[in-house]
C-alpha cells in the first residue's frame, strides 16, 4: 500500500471514528434529553396533581365558609331569642295569675301573641310534646308520674315550653313522663 493510500485510509478511519464519536455524543445527548423530558413530564404530572388538590381544598374551604356564614346568620339571634322566650314565660305566668275578664289580662295576651308571632317569623318554634314519647334531644324529664293507661316514657305534662331555632334546639321542654305502676 502506498503512502497516499495509507494516508487516505487513515483519514477515512479518522473521519469514521469522528463520526462515530459524534454519533455517540448525539446519542448520549438524546438520551440525556429523553431523561430530562421524562423527568419534566413526571414533574408536570406532580404539579398537575398538586393543582387539582389545591383547587379541591379551596372549594372545600369555600363551602365550609359559606356554611359558617349561613349558620352565623341563622343563629346570630340565639341569645336574644333565649331572652325573649324567658320574657314570654313571664307573660304566661302573669296571664295564669290574672283572671280572664281582667282588662290587663287581655292586653298581656295580645302582647304575648304578637311576640310569639314575631319569634315564629324568625324561625323560632315552640316544642309541644304532650302525648309524644320522650326524646332526650328535645326534652328534659323532670318527674315520672305513674300512669298505667299510657306507654312508659309518654309525655303527660309540660312544665316549661321548649323551643327550636331553625330546627336546632334553643331550649329543651321540661316535661313529666309516664311510667307504669309495677
Curated annotation (Swiss-Prot):
Residues 1-37 are annotated as: Disordered. Participates actively in the response to hyperosmotic and heat shock by preventing the aggregation of stress-denatured proteins, in association with DnaK and GrpE. It is the nucleotide exchange factor for DnaK and may function as a thermosensor. Unfolded proteins bind initially to DnaJ; upon interaction with the DnaJ-bound protein, DnaK hydrolyzes its bound ATP, resulting in the formation of a stable complex. GrpE releases ADP from DnaK; ATP binding to DnaK triggers the release of the substrate protein, thus completing the reaction cycle. The gene is grpE. GO terms for cellular component: cytoplasm. One of its GO terms (molecular function) is protein-folding chaperone binding. The keyword Kinase does not apply. It holds the Pfam family GrpE. The keyword Cytoplasm applies. It is found in: Cytoplasm. One of its GO terms (biological process) is protein folding. Belongs to the GrpE family. Its main location: cytoplasm. Keywords: Chaperone, Cytoplasm, Stress response. HAMAP family: GrpE. This is Protein GrpE. It comes from Wolbachia sp. subsp. Brugia malayi (strain TRS). SUPFAM superfamilies: Coiled-coil domain of nucleotide exchange factor GrpE (SSF58014), Head domain of nucleotide exchange factor GrpE (SSF51064). Homodimer.
